[in-house]
A protein has these predicted regions:
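Conserved beta-loop-beta/alpha segment of the NTase-like Rossmann-fold superfamily
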Residues: 69-145, 149
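N-terminal nucleotide-binding beta1-loop-alpha1 segment
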Residues: 1-19
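Conserved core of the sugar-phosphate nucleotidyltransferase
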Residues: 113-193
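Conserved alpha/beta core of the MobA/IspD/sugar-nucleotide pyrophosphorylase nucleotidyltransferase superfamily
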Residues: 1-3, 167-242
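Conserved beta-strand segments of alpha/beta enzyme cores
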Residues: 24, 75-77, 212-214
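A structural signal for short hydrophobic beta-strand segments in well-ordered beta-sheet cores
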Residues: 25, 147-149, 215
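Conserved N-terminal catalytic core of the sugar/cofactor nucleotidyltransferase
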Residues: 1-5, 32-103, 194
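Short catalytic helix/loop segments, enriched in acidic residues and glycine
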Residues: 20-36
Length: 242
């Protein structure tokens, strides 16, 4: 199983801190960036063959890759996103060769404990579907990537849906099994071809409608997606405990 990290984003709401920096390289401890915490977590569960998609300020991640390799004992392949102004459905599609034989997918702006990856890998041993980490404990907001679950698995993954009928929030970490990889690639292509501003979760929705997505609970853990300065402050607090 490989690791695929989506790190092409700037994070407009984090400017000017991200003017010359991808948001994944924002520091969260004295020695680690967001990206460091992700790579360390993957290495801790034995996922050491990594691909990182780059776009905004790509050279900064290129410079940091050898540090990641030395520090965490991983190998890093850089995947160039030639259309960084498109959304992440395209960004993930550019990494299709890297998830073809199974991968843990992590959004480059999420700070979370390693238990997330560990639980996904354990569940994948008996569940052949694409599995998403679902926080079914926290209070949902309008901004959350909400997930509705039915008897056959995920039915709807979208921010625009009623909080009342959502089971939880997708935290931006998932497991792509070999058996679903080709269908995911086709779904991603259909998604960005339809609209370049769409997210990879819009491709996940196509798979959900075919009964190909399951959920794994995060349990009551602290995590955050870093979209603004308040999130960044929270990420620093969480990272200190990882």
């Amino acid at each position: 199983v490989r690791g695929v990290i989506l790190a092409a984003g700037q994070g407009q709401r984090l400017r000017p801190d991200t003017d010359a920096l991808p948001k994944t390289l924002l520091p969260v401890t004295a020695t680690e960036t967001i990206l460091d915490t992700i790579v360390r977590g993957l290495a801790e569960v034995g996922v050491t063959d990594l691909a990182i998609t780059v776009g905004h300020a790509a050279e900064r991640i290129r410079e940091h890759a050898p540090v990641l390799e030395d520090r965490y004992g991983v190998s890093v392949a850089i995947v160039d996103n030639d259309k960084p102004h498109w959304n992440n459905a395209y960004s993930l599609w550019t990494a299709r060769e890297h998830y073809a034989h199974g991968a843990v997918l992590v959004n480059g702006d999420t700070v979370h404990p390693t238990s997330i990856e560990r639980n996904l890998l354990a569940a994948a041993a008996t569940d052949p579907r694409l599995l998403i980490a679902l926080d079914d404990h926290k209070q949902l907001t309008d901004e959350a990537m909400k997930v509705r679950v039915g008897a056959g698995g995920v039915e709807l993954i979208h921010k625009q849906q009623p909080i009342a009928t959502a089971a939880g929030e997708y935290i931006g970490v998932s497991l792509i099994p070999t058996g679903v990889a080709e269908d995911l690639t086709k779904a991603l292509e259909a998604t960005y071809t339809r609209d370049t501003t769409l997210y990879y979760e819009d491709a996940f929705q196509l798979l959900a409608e075919a009964g190909q997505i399951g959920t794994v609970s995060t349990g009551p853990v602290a995590w955050t997606e870093v979209d603004d300065h308040a999130d960044w402050a929270l990420a620093k607090t969480i990272a200190e405990g990882l």
